[in-house]
Amino acid sequence: MTIIPVNNTIMNSVTYVLYSEDVDYCVLIDCGEYETLKPMLDKMGKKVKAVLLTHGHSDHIYGLNQLLEAYPDVMVCTTEDGHREIQDAKLNFSYLHDDPFAVKGYKKKVLTDGQTVSFDGLEDIDVIATPGHDSSCLSYKLGMNLFTGDAYIPGVKVFYKFPRGNKELALSSYEMLANMQKEGFHIYCAHHTY
């Protein structure tokens, strides 16, 4: 399994491309700028099969509409709350920016804590609920790799003062993920460093 980080210009978010040479597709963790992703996807020659969202805030989904135009069969995977957020410009906070948007008309998969997501030819991905920054926050475990979104950015205090944030849950999720890092998991967070 190969993991490629793609740095986006909006809010320094990071999209991760997961793929294997053995299959003709890839899976994304979050979806940043499609203009940044497209050249890489074209060069790889792989179609996008699914996007696993760490949560539904606009900086993690702002390229999703363009991606879905190019790859209409993409499965968008997140919690029920996450699906509500991406379908509403106010809930995903894009209304605060120049170009508010909502994502509509897509293939939906609801993820829950403890679930395992499987794709032929790729390692299984374990879903871990990590609420607090937002109620929709998920982290993904792939072998000894841990994709934490905004729930855990090493050395950065978790921000939980959004309408669907929760201080106690945020601190609990942060502590759990920090302990996993101490156990040897490699952290792939959604901003700053990876």
Task: Describe these PLM feature segments.
Residues 1, 46, 74, 123-125, ...:
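A structural micro-motif
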Residues 6, 18, 115-121:
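Short acidic-hydrophobic surface loop/beta-edge motif
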Residues 124-194:
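Metallo-beta-lactamase
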Residues 6-8, 107-108, 128-131:
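Short Gly/Pro-enriched turn/cap motifs at secondary-structure boundaries
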